[in-house]
Amino acid sequence: PDTAPMIRKIVEKGIHIISEIEFAGRYTDSKMICITGSNGKTTTTSLIYHIFKEAGYDAGLAGNIGNSLALQVAEDPHEYYIIELSSFQLDNMYDFRANIAILLNITPDHLDRYDNCMQNYVDAKMRIIQNQTDKDAFIYWNDDPIIKRELEKYDIKAVQYPFSELKEKGSIGYI
């Protein structure tokens, strides 16, 4: 945990603690389809993985579900990785780039890890779009008031695909 004395000493020395996803991402050129949100991550990740596999794509399932991304990159590499990302994993990502970032929603969760500060948790979730370029895609729930507020703070380079419950101006898709 981030509060462990050894981890604190390492961080105090300016050394980054990186997530397993950050580590593995350094050793592959595969396309990364990353899903985060407070709710619905596992279901969405599983459905996308299923669609990729049924369509005949070489895809691996990683993150909070499936096998370790690092293990797959080393021993069973895939052209695509469908990755469920928790806020914990996003916290320790610096150079990793999601080719497709999907942000489902942001609601209060795990606030004890974030000094009971909702904005700290929100900032962690928004890290999914860091390092994206104009060649990438960002899909997000346009009905979430927190996401809408946060988007105003970012210079998003990825092509945006907002979706909503009802057909509305500005949304690409609706359910």
What kind of feature is each model-predicted range?
Residues 1-142, 146-157:
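Phosphate-binding loop of NTP-binding sites
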Residues 18-23, 155-175:
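Beta-strand->loop->alpha-helix junctions that form or flank phosphate-binding loops
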